[in-house]
Amino acid sequence: MKSMASEHSSIKERKCAGYVWRGMTLDESFYLRAVAIVMIMAHNYLHWMPGSPGENEFGFNADRVALMLEGLWQNPWDAPRLLASYFGHYGVQVFFFLSAYGLTKKYSAASPAWWSFQTKRWKAFYPAIILSALGYLIYEGFRVGWGEVWHDDVLNLLRQMVGVSNFIPANVYRPIGPWWFIGAILQFYLVLPFLWRVLQKYGDKVLYALLVGGWILQCVLGHIIYAQFDLNINHSILGHLGVCSMGIWFARRNEVTIPWWLLLLSVVMFIGGNFFYELWIPSRVVLLLFLLPLLRGVCGYLGKRRWCGAVLLLLGQLSVYLFLCNGYLRRPIVEWAKQESHWWTSTWTCIVFIMIVTAWALMMRTFERRIFLVLGRRPR
């Protein structure tokens, strides 16, 4: 009895000291993926609408937040479009965190060989990439013509698929804008086994060095490679070292108490990061300090509701296909919506767009599973 009372008292003290982060279940990670992918899809669609303020995703400009605030003041009903177009891209940071967190939980203790780890990741990732690429060629072939797609897109698409388009300025977003992420995540896979080995020897000091080093690279190297080569550091894993280090750090702990003062400070710093370049540099990391606890709370609540939990789980399980396919399925609906000036047009067409992408992703996953069954492989 005394032991139980002592344990209860200890838990209460930790909650008073701050937010208590505990390891995520698989369902929780799917819920977070679901929210993140909806943020990304809404952003990828709505930032094409006329009057969108832009976003501080790959570069900083304080005028963008000013435009968003001005739009909210002039037309509060347009808030979904303005907020999603400006903030929605942060869903990508949730994915970087979850990738670092999940892979570290799964593999770091075993210290897999470099080549073995790469082949496992390729086998897990490339079926979806290949099917989504074929889906793009078929979709665009019917939409604009096979000759045009073959002449303009095939080479650029192949470079995006293997992750080298990030080093070719004209190819980064062509033909599928969000596929810059493929190159960045493949780079992360390349260095992760080495990082785990170094961590075993030197511990968390490595993560702290990566966190600070990533910010220094952003400030110094980012300007140099942009000026000299027209390349953006945020199209590579170098621009996301802080978030990935954070994911690994949390994965190495079963429980973390984040002090309330640190959560409050992270909110203040993130707000400041929309106005000042110096605070924008660490804004992705400080955002996740309070966003992830918030999302876990919301998802935990919704997950207990039968239909909400089922929808979140489905979207989370489809998140790879949703990410890979949403970029090209924007057309032609986004072109039509851009011609309409009413705020509600962007909102309802965005909902329709997300539903279309979800149906397409379900179809892609069904094809993948059928192919795996024919080949005698276990479906994902």
Range-by-range predicted roles:
Residues 44-51, 137-144, 164, 197, ...:
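Transmembrane helix-loop junctions and nearby membrane-interface residues
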Residues 1-214, 318, 339-380:
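Membrane-cytosol interface segments of multi-pass membrane proteins
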Residues 192-199, 204-249:
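Loop-centered beta-sheet repeat module
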Residues 227-353:
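Alpha-helical transmembrane segments and terminal signal-anchor/GPI-anchor hydrophobic tails
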Residues 178, 182-183, 222, 282-285:
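Long, hydrophobic alpha-helical transmembrane bundles and adjoining juxtamembrane helices/loops
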Residues 34, 44-45, 94, 122, ...:
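Hydrophobic alpha-helical segments, especially transmembrane helices
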